[in-house]
Amino acid sequence: MNMKTIEDVFIHLLSDTYSAEKQLTRALAKLARATSNEKLSQAFHAHLEETHGQIERIDQVVESESNLKIKRMKCVAMEGLIEEANEVIESTEKNEVRDAALIAAAQKVEHYEIASYGTLATLAEQLGYRKAAKLLKETLEEEKATDIKLTDLAINNVNKKAENKA
């Protein structure tokens, strides 16, 4: 995509984020199946449901401004993050150590999404897209909350069990 304006940058980032979320919906179910920890599996399933809502919210962002149209593209960053998670699954047994590594992989995804939605919300505000900015901030807060939940699960549950495994 040839970007000449800040709006072009916004559309590119929105399209990239849409692709990232779509890829993530396919990956989260696999992550939930790969874990040995029920709480972690539930967290992955909950984030899958939340991700469906976030995709719908991106659709609402597009509908909120008549000049916005998502471009077909593939988010190579998310593709790489998902590949890392798949490598964790392939290189570990289904136990607490894998669970700890899957949380680390999932948090990389969350941090990427936090960066994406933070930038998108800022650009939407700058472009005067009030409704879009509000929707994007809502998703940003969900991503931050998911990251906090994963950190809590790691510290108070999974990592302790993985440490005792050694």
Curated annotation (Swiss-Prot):
Gene3D superfamilies hit by this protein: 1.20.1260.10
Taxonomy, superkingdom: Bacteria
Pfam families in UniProt: DUF892 (PF05974)
InterPro entries documented for this protein: DUF892_YciF-like, Ferritin-like, Ferritin-like_SF, YciF
GO molecular function: protein homodimerization activity
GO biological process, any: DNA damage response
Residues that span the membrane, as ranges: none
Matches recorded under CDD domains: YciF
Subunit-structure text: Homodimer.
Name of this chain's protein: Protein YciF
Species this chain originates from: Escherichia coli (strain K12)
Designated gene of the protein: yciF
